[in-house]
A protein has these predicted regions:
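Conserved AMP-binding A3 loop
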Residues: 1-22
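Conserved G/P- and acidic residue-centered "switch" motifs that form tight phosphate/ATP-binding loops
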Residues: 5-6, 62, 121, 144, ...
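Short beta-strand->loop structural element characteristic of the AMP-binding/adenylate-forming
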Residues: 11-14, 41-42, 63-70, 140
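Conserved AMP-binding/adenylation subdomain of ANL enzymes
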Residues: 21-38, 46-88, 98-99, 103
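Gly/Ser/Thr-rich phosphate-binding loop
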Residues: 31, 87-92, 101-162, 175, ...
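Phosphate-coordination loops involved in phosphoryl transfer and adenosine-cofactor binding
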Residues: 35-36, 113-114, 218
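Conserved ATP-binding/catalytic segment of the ANL
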Residues: 169, 184-189, 193-230
């Protein structure tokens, strides 16, 4: 899957079956995915979020997907609120949540069937989290990359308001650390570059050995993202 990541230049991150399997395992438990899951998918399946984060875990569990060709906030709300569909799961980047909460049908939409809502791909504004929380929907926040297939870090819904702005903790089978410019691990509270490793990490970039070499320190993927432990 091609991604520009933090460099701005698209690179083909190689995605193998092991990565996808461990991504399913890593996400299934915190997202409460089961055979009863009905998930509305609004991201395109050529995107790692649409395919690997949102669709594959549900397919693996034997749940049900509802796909829409183009995102429309009114249509998405009508599906979420339709008792015939009983949508239990919805995941998206922050923008769709904002478009839906600004839609005139938002306040009147019945969201009682929605048990799990997830957001990632970009920092989520506090106003979005609080607006949806006021409707009884607490969001699972997370961090990931195409290179991490994409699940890497997750914040449980019960901590959404207590830890506003946090990406959470490493998911199953992943390990993270924060390092300085010399690659030395930093103490808690100091900002540095996030490194991550695990069986869900890409082996490298397609036909781009230079990018692969520059992106790894041993088996640690250098994400290029700033982070700190609290």
């Amino acid at each position: 899957m091609y991604t520009s990541g933090t460099t701005g230049h698209p690179k083909g991150a190689m995605i193998n079956h092991q990565m996808q399997l461990y991504n399913v395992i890593n996400l299934a438990s915190p997202a409460f995915v089961s055979t009863d899951t009905v998930q509305l998918v609004v991201l395109p399946l050529f995107h790692t979020g649409g395919m690997n984060c949102y669709a594959n875990p549900v397919l693996h569990a034997g749940g049900e997907l509802i796909l829409i060709r183009d995102f429309d906030p009114g249509l998405a709300l009508s599906i979420l609120g339709n008792p015939e569909f009983q949508v239990s799961h919805f995941f998206a980047v922050p923008a769709p949540y904002q478009f839906m909460m600004n839609h005139p049908d938002f306040d009147s939409t019945d969201l009682s069937s929605l048990k799990v809502a997830g957001v990632g791909g970009a920092p989520c504004a506090e106003a979005i989290l609080r607006t949806w929380s006021d409707r009884g929907v607490s969001m699972i926040q997370g961090w990931g990359m195409t290179e991490t297939s994409p699940g890497g870090i997750g914040l449980p819904a019960e901590d959404a308001e207590r830890k506003l702005g946090s990406a959470g903790k490493p998911l199953l089978h992943t390990e993270v650390k924060v390092v300085d410019d010399e690659g030395q691990e930093l103490p808690w509270g100091e900002v540095g570059e996030l490194y991550i490793r695990g069986p869900n990490i890409t082996p490298g970039y397609w036909n781009n050995e230079e990018a692969t070499q520059n992106s790894f320190e041993g088996d640690w993927l250098k994400t290029g993202d700033a982070a700190r432990f609290d």
